[in-house]
């Protein structure tokens, strides 16, 4: 549990208030870029008076587009009228040098609106990087969706690199890029960066967010109002100089929410993060907006996850002044909840004015060695290189600059080892800057217009093994050292196509014919000696490298077999028998876990196990079972998962669990499972095909939230007792994609088929294979298709539901399920389409009837409720 800090109130003289208001108009710490507007153009935004400039000076690639005219509405912010897209290259970057550089804290914001600018009608999905580290993924649902990504970051250098990385799911683009200078003494955390999760203006009556000029830092405060809450407000200014530094705007702090019923004793705000391992920092802003009579008080205690904030016993908001409670250490878990509980002596209920929540993002990847960066940037400037050379030369891994190759070793910055500038229009002499690229192994300067002599310093690059200077205009005599290295075999040297370049003294004054020279290596005793020495060194290097690679993937998540025995209490309790081995109950650091012991007959080898674990450790989603740790010791292999103790979807459908799922619960569980699969297909790199989607692999927690299990395992392990079955055909009869099964090739559409079958089970409550039916109607898809063709939806839906379902929605979901379970992959939906259909249906199901749930649920996953029951939460202390 993190401690909270309480920022006391400090009053300032009126002239300080005036000074702050004047500063509120100051944009000196702002960089506001409208991507896609003409070069050197600028304008002032009509609503905010912020000056926006063209992005042309900050990027060297991309194409400019206007969004579709039908989306250019009057109320659309001007910044979304144009975009810059990046159809070429895997990584494209913006380089921005803000007014204050290294060591200063900035709010960095990117905004995206597709607007069907390319007339393809398909919104893209791509990754967003800050420097060399993944910031977030950008997923747009449709043409009018506006996605905003915001991060608070202390600069490590004078420049900010914002990069878009193509995931082959549509062309990356950018609408707006904004930087806002913050005070270094606010949002102070141990984390490198804070990604905005939610920022709410509670009680705001408008639809638009508050921002600059109301907020001097131009933060977006989204309006949020809860049903059955009372809005409190004041026309007086909330003093923005209350000295906590956060300075939430007066327009935000002048409204608050409180329970409408005076008998309500508490407000509870909670949400379930998609990943229980996410770490959050929370900031709650309070200001009393009512002038209370002397005989009345408003005081309350604040709890986070049932523990009281470590301040005084009760908190009393100050009239017209802002106080901020914030968590000093990050909090995490599957369920985050903070409660405002009315004090015993209080005559007024609790209030809230504003909330900010941020998620940590540990930026662990290292940028390229600074010496190499300086050198390659000098080369770029010297030769006016016309390549997409922005951002980091080597990182992120897999996305180096065009013509650049790098070496990557653990805990060390990447180094540039190869530079290919052939056909780059280079002119002038070979610059001495190349000698500063000390790890350089390959240098290709061929097919340019370089002049002058070949410099001696190239022979002094210790690791250089290939040098190509062909087809230039070089003159003079080839340096003796280079010639010697070529002869002894330590350097592959190409200098053909330089008519005035002499490779020996005899041709000093002789014009050579235009031909290709490839200087052969000389087979000599010395050459053999160096070759043997190189082979020995290479063998030792590979041996060391192999010894490193066979170590634990992540020591923090690696457990010895003896620890597994202890965690499971010597394998005392068996939870179940999975396809890959038994699953045991365990307790790890006070938390329940499920340990899957992979049977010795199922393991395909350590390399496959390592690759599987390495992939699974990176997969995090609220609808996927979280992998907590692993073990590989000798022939013992185990995977440690979070514990889900409420059974599987199969238990509910088969009647093993006596509870009957309502229609809405079935839709929610189906949506959860679909979202998990959609993440495996589109949110993982490389994509993961589950290959064994079925109800028993969909676990249900106590809140009836579904989580997919056993994803990925079928790629590296065979089913126990079925060791002769190819890993390519893992799956369960009835759920197997018939088209791919026959070819033994599986894809995402194979999972779509299996999910369609599961969805039919959820709708009907019937088994997949019916032995009592004729051969052509044994499979559930055949039976449902036949009944649907007769227009009899009631005979399709599970009779246990009675009349408690929407026939129109049932018809629609049945059609979705059959479209998924189509025998032809071409006619099947994608999981993204399935998720969209289920979301819409669930929304309609919830609005068409009264669920009896008193909580208010936002699509943002945050919920608020009021209660008068003091027993469910801790008492004030």
UniProtKB/Swiss-Prot annotation:
PROSITE patterns: PROTEIN_KINASE_ATP, PROTEIN_KINASE_DOM, PROTEIN_KINASE_ST. LRR repeats lie at residues 439-462, 463-484. It is a single-pass type I membrane protein. The active site is at residue 692. It holds the Pfam family LRR_8. It comes from the Eukaryota. SUPFAM superfamilies: L domain-like, Protein kinase-like (PK-like). The modification Phosphoserine is found at residue 726. Residues 1-24 form the signal peptide. GO terms for cellular component: plasma membrane. Residues 539-877 are cytoplasmic. Glycans are attached at residues 142, 233, 261, 295, 405, 420. It is found in: Cell membrane. Residues 569-842 form the Protein kinase domain. The modification Phosphothreonine is found at residues 727, 732. GO terms for molecular function: ATP binding; protein serine kinase activity; protein serine/threonine kinase activity. Its EC number is 2.7.11.1. Disulfide bonds: none annotated. It is an enzyme of class 2 (transferase). It catalyses: L-seryl-[protein] + ATP = O-phospho-L-seryl-[protein] + ADP + H(+); L-threonyl-[protein] + ATP = O-phospho-L-threonyl-[protein] + ADP + H(+). The keyword Glycoprotein applies. ATP binds at residues 575-583, 596. Belongs to the protein kinase superfamily. Ser/Thr protein kinase family. PANTHER family: OS07G0107800 PROTEIN-RELATED, PROTEIN KINASE DOMAIN-CONTAINING PROTEIN. This is Putative leucine-rich repeat receptor-like serine/threonine-protein kinase At2g19230. It comes from Arabidopsis thaliana.
């Amino acid at each position: 549990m993190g401690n909270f800090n309480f920022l006391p109130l400090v009053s300032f003289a009126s002239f300080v208030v005036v000074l702050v208001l004047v500063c509120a108009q100051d944009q000196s710490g702002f960089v506001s870029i409208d991507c896609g507007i003409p070069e050197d153009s600028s304008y002032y935004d009509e609503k905010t008076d912020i000056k926006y400039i063209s992005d042309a000076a900050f990027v060297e690639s991309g194409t400019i587009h206007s969004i579709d005219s039908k989306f250019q509405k009057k109320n659309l912010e001007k910044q979304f009228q144009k975009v810059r897209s990046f159809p070429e290259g895997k990584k494209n970057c913006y380089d921005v040098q803000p007014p204050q550089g290294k060591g200063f804290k900035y709010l960095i914001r990117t905004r995206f609106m597709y607007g069907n600018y390319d007339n393809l009608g398909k919104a893209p999905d791509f990754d967003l990087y800050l420097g060399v580290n993944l910031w977030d993924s950008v997923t747009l649902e449709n043409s009018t969706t506006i996605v905003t990504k915001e991060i608070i970051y202390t600069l490590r250098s004078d420049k900010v690199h914002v990069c878009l990385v193509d995931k082959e799911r549509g062309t990356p683009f950018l609408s707006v890029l904004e930087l806002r200078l913050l005070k270094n003494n606010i949002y102070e955390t141990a984390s490198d960066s804070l990604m905005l999760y939610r920022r709410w203006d509670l009680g705001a009556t408008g639809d638009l967010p508050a921002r600059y000029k109301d907020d001097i830092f131009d933060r977006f405060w989204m309006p949020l109002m809860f049903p059955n809450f009372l809005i409190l407000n004041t026309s007086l200014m909330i003093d923005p100089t209350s000295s906590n530094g956060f300075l939430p705007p007066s327009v935000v702090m002048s409204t608050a929410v409180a329970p409408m019923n005076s008998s309500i004793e508490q407000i509870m705000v909670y949400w379930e993060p998609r990943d229980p391992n996410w770490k959050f920092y929370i900031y709650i802003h309070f200001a009393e907006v009512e002038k209370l009579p002397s005989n009345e008080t408003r005081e309350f205690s604040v709890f986070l996850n049932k523990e009281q904030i470590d301040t005084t016993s009760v908190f009393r908001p100050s009239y017209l002044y802002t106080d901020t409670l914030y968590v000093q250490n990050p909090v995490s878990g599957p369920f985050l909840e903070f409660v405002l509980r009315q004090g015993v002596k209080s005559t007024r209920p609790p209030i809230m004015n504003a909330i900010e929540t941020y998620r940590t993002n540990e930026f662990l990847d290292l940028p390229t060695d600074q010496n190499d960066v300086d050198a390659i940037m000098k080369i770029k400037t010297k030769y006016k290189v016309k390549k997409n050379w922005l951002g980091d030369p080597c990182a992120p891994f897999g996305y180096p600059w065009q013509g650049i190759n790098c070496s990557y070793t653990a805990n060390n910055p990447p180094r540039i080892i190869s530079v290919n500038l052939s056909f780059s229009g280079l002119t002038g002499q070979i610059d001495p800057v190349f000698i500063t690229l000390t790890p350089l192994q390959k240098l290709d300067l061929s097919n340019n217009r370089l002049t002058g002599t070949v410099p001696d310093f190239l022979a002094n690059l210790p690791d250089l093994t290939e040098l190509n200077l062909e087809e230039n205009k070089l003159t003079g005599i080839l340096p003796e050292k280079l010639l010697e290295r070529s002869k002894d075999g330590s350097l592959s040297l190409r200098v053909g196509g330089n008519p005035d370049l002499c490779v020996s003294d005899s041709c000093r004054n002789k014009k050579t014919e235009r031909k290709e020279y490839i200087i052969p290596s000389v087979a000599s005793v010395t050459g053999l000696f160096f070759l043997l020495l190189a082979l020995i060194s290479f063998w030792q290097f590979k041996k060391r490298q192999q010894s490193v690679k066979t170590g634990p993937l992540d020591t923090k998540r690696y457990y010895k077999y003896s620890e597994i025995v202890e965690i499971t209490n010597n394998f005392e309790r068996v939870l179940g028998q999975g396809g890959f081995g038994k699953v045991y109950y365990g307790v790890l650091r006070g938390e329940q876990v499920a340990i899957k012991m992979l049977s010795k007959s199922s393991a395909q080898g350590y390399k496959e196990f390592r690759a599987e674990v390495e992939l699974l450790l990176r997969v995090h989603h609220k609808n996927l079972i979280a992998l907590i740790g692993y073990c590989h010791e000798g022939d013992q292999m185990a995977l440690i998962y979070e514990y889900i103790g409420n059974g599987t979807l199969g238990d509910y459908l088969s009647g093993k669990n006596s509870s009957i799922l309502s229609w809405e619960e079935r839709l929610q569980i189906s949506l959860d499972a679909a979202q998990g699969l959609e993440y495996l297909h589109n949110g993982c790199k490389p994509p993961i095909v589950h290959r064994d989607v079925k109800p028993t692999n969909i676990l249900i927690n106590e809140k009836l939230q579904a989580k997919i299990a056993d994803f990925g395992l079928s790629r590296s392990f065979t089913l126990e007792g079925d060791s002769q079955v190819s890993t390519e055909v893992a799956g369960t009869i009835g759920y197997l994609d018939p088209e791919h099964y026959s070819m033994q090739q599986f894809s995402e559409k194979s999972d779509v088929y299996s999910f369609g079958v599961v969805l039919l089970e959820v709708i009907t409550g019937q088994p997949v294979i019916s032995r009592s039916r004729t051969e052509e109607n044994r499979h559930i898809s055949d039976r449902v298709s036949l009944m649907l063709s007769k227009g009899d939806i009631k005979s399709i839906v599970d009779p246990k539901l009675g009349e408690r379902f929407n026939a129109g929605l049932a018809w629609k979901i049945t059609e979705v399920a059959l479209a998924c379970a189509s025998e032809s992959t071409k006619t099947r939906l994608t999981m993204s389409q399935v998720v969209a259909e289920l979301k819409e249906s669930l929304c309609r199901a919830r609005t068409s009837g009264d669920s009896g749930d008193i909580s208010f649920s936002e699509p943002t996953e945050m919920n608020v409720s009021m209660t008068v029951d003091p027993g469910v939460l801790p008492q004030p202390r």
